[in-house]
Regions:
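Post-HExxH zinc-binding segment in Zn-dependent metallohydrolases
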Residues: 2-45
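Pan-zinc metallopeptidase signature
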Residues: 34-35, 46-114
Length: 114
């Protein structure tokens, strides 16, 4: 079994939010974890967590995803959604495939976060 790393957690939740947004497009604006950071805050958080993307330390995963004194609230969710959305923007053809099967590393390469 593969480890559940920070990168996999980001993409896992990003996929879930993207799928929900496709099913219920009007509801996605009501979910704070999809837009809780500005572009500058996303960049800063990404630079901070990038060295830990392969970490499977549950404490780090929880802090990044949900927030703590070291990380903004819902920051990991926001980045996860952004990774998926920028992959869709950069490669709209993947929406015509079963994109839910793409792994985290593939989404990262297709996104603006590579």
């Amino acid at each position: 079994m593969r480890e559940f790393t920070l990168l996999r957690y980001l993409v896992f939740e990003g996929k879930a939010e993207a799928f929900a947004g496709l099913l219920y497009p009007l509801e996605k604006e009501k979910i704070p974890n999809t837009f809780s950071l500005t572009d500058n805050e996303k960049k800063a958080l990404w630079l901070k967590i990038k060295p830990a993307l392969q970490s499977d330390n549950w404490d780090i995963l929880m802090e990044v995803m949900f927030g703590s004194k070291n990380y903004p609230n819902y920051g990991g969710y926001t980045l996860g959604v952004d990774i998926i959305q920028t992959a869709f923007k950069n490669h709209p053809e993947i929406l015509k495939t079963n994109w839910t099967y793409l792994d985290a590393e593939s989404f990262l390469k297709l996104s603006d976060y590579n």
